[in-house]
């Protein structure tokens, strides 16, 4: 009887538990529903009902203890559930991904919606019937669990021994488990994820909320039976089904709790400890998976940020890379060009919603050229890259050209459109030549601007200057009428030019790769949307162009050179290419169009004017005359060459006969002198030798002749080249002022195209002599160890004084060694016994050997001979003749730099005047001797 009475108290105990929990079957939001892990006791009890009936005879004290422990256990679990829910809620995305992985591993497919609804209705009917049966059984005195109750799903810690079929598991009701940490995944979690700082909606490409399945356990734990999986699938169908399922769990949990109350205290404690371990394992796995998910999100964000940093947007107008909210750098979705909103005149309210404004932007942006569907050519420069603006006449110009070229105006200053070119003077087209254009055929196209530094005469195109980083803009704080200015390379800031040049190169490389990368990144739907939007813009632009009023143009048609249009030049070059005409063989003559000797203009710019037409026909007539004249001159040249060959033969014969006569004359002169001396001895008087018997007077060579003695009295009529040893093309022979040899212009190394310019203070030397000077300098620099190293060596390399060592005084009456000759005029002479030496070509090896024997002394310049002031090698120059030093400013006229140039020598003004006086004195003496000889010849006749 006692046992039966105790057994009857199970129902009030379960009711008291429900009242203590404030449970309401209509609202189960206070609980987190999961697997029936708490019904393990009932599951075990169902396996052995006799054991439950045997345990029903426990004392009242044991029941009270059990009730208190259950209450404490429930309170602890509620606190743990709240804490775990707060930790798990930010990781909804993680749980969803884990559920998706489990579904892929299990290979389960969701059932159709209709089948699920039918199964739900059947389960609800069964639940109602079982609820009524359980109520009636609880009211009766029976202490065992009903046989119709299905077996509970066991947790992984307690293995089950019952096996059920799939149909039984589908119809199996769910159990109420208080120890299951299972958060409710509703769509409120989407808002929480969006509120997170590191959340990006584009990273959730694999998240499909419509097919989300709610899991019963974490991915780290073992899955339950098939019945559990079916229950989980049912729970993912909607919020209403979740509430119904949780309500069913409540109905089926009451008999399980009653059966659990009949167990021993030891078994209850062991089960509680096992569940606690399970709970801690769940929390650990959830925390680990949450940390892994956070690391993955951080890695994705870093990769995305690094990818964005690799493509820093640069404005193609100002070459700046600062993008602010008030002035963003926008990118065209068609051509990929990037520009600031302010630099392009984009309206921030209507046009600034572009593809690069945000990662989730929906409105594409296009530049004006893409909207009109054209590939424009600038009217002001020959370059084709960059961003364009349309003029009021339908032409196109670079926006940077319109900003920097004077005379260009805008209809709307804020939007920088339309561009007006009629206010600019047409004479500027092709007036100046660009100094930066790589192709000289485009140097006079468009309009060139000048350097803004004072009186600088450098001219260049705007876009050519932009390539070199020479464009500048005044600060916004400065109130300047024209804030855009440009400098040449000489006057531009070096650091400013460096970073602008760097940004320009980066912009060019990015624009080439951006289109390919954007096509790869964009999906076909996004690309189709962009193309559709572009077609809409082009249709609007075509409509606006047809309805746009005509721009004002001057009444008189202004002529403009055809060569000033870059597009026309390209088309003409293309035409020449198709016709098979090479455009490289025609030199570009951009010289000034000055009049020729006969008063006719040599060249006129092509234009649609009557003046150019007259010039064109006149040029054709002149071309015919020139061709006829060339044919005549060619015939004359052939005749003269034949005559020259005959004359060369006669000349050689005459030279041979002249030498014979000179030898005979010398013999006769010596015989006459002997006879005349004999007559003097006979008479005993010293007789004057007649002029006819006198030898030709030996005279000193002038300084202009370089101090060399003539080897023969034979006049030199034809000169031979020192390299090819031929005497043709006498007009192309060039005299070296150092070695006194003649050279053809084409025989030199490197060949010359024209005669070098000589002045009174400078002269020219051949490459062989110049190489000798450079070898002298190398030997000198090898011996010197100067403190200022590089600067001193560079300066001395450029100095032309490098042939005669200063410590060796010139020796009179001796010819100096040719390998050590000076660049100045030589003062040494050849004695009479050595004057018949033949001139032998010099060899490099002998010269170098002599140089090694006689190294040149160090050239130290300390005092100016004019002002007697001190100086050094930086501000003094030494004369090659008198070896005196002069300040640059003490010369007449004063100079700012050294007058010496590489390959040329230099003498002071005094030496130049003295040499001219000596030449005059020698000429006077020669004339006097000729007059004396004439006087002596006349009385004999």
From Swiss-Prot:
Zn(2+) 8 binds at residues 864, 867, 887, 890. Zn(2+) 3 binds at residues 378, 381, 398, 401. One of its GO terms (molecular function) is histone reader activity. Zn(2+) 5 binds at residues 451, 456, 488, 491. InterPro entries: EPHD (IPR034732), Histone_Mod_Regulator (IPR050701), Zinc_finger_PHD-type_CS (IPR019786), Znf_FYVE_PHD (IPR011011), Znf_PHD (IPR001965), Znf_PHD-finger (IPR019787), Znf_RING/FYVE/PHD (IPR013083). The modification Phosphoserine is found at residues 26, 29, 84, 189, 201, 283, 287, 291, 295, 301, 352, 523, 774-775, 828. Zn(2+) 2 binds at residues 332, 335, 367, 370. Zn(2+) 9 binds at residues 879, 882, 908, 911. Residues 281-290, 930-941 have a biased composition (Polar residues). Disruption phenotype: Death just after birth due to respiratory failure with lungs showing interstitial hyperplasia. Abnormalities are also observed in other organs such as kidney and lung. Mesenchymal fibroblasts exhibit increased proliferation and increased PDGFRA expression. Conditional knockout in germinal center (GC) B cells results in reduced GC response in the spleen following immune challenge, with fewer and smaller GCs observed. High levels detected in testis, lung and spleen and low levels in muscle, heart, intestine and kidney (at protein level). Widely expressed in adult with increased levels in intestine, colon and lung. A zinc finger (PHD-type) spans 312-373, 432-492, 718-772, 861-914. Keywords: Chromosome, Coiled coil, Cytoplasm, Metal-binding, Nucleus, Phosphoprotein, Repeat, Repressor, Transcription, Transcription regulation, Zinc, Zinc-finger. Zn(2+) 4 binds at residues 434, 437, 461, 464. Pfam families: PHD (PF00628), PHD_2 (PF13831), zf-HC5HC2H_2 (PF13832). It comes from the Eukaryota. Residues 22-295, 804-855, 912-941 are annotated as: Disordered. Residues 60-72, 194-205, 226-249 have a biased composition (Acidic residues). The N-terminal region, including the PHD-type 1 and 2 zinc fingers and the C2HC pre-PHD-type zinc finger, is required for binding to histone H3. This is PHD finger protein 14. It comes from Mus musculus (Mouse). The lineage of its organism: Eukaryota, Metazoa, Chordata, Craniata, Vertebrata.
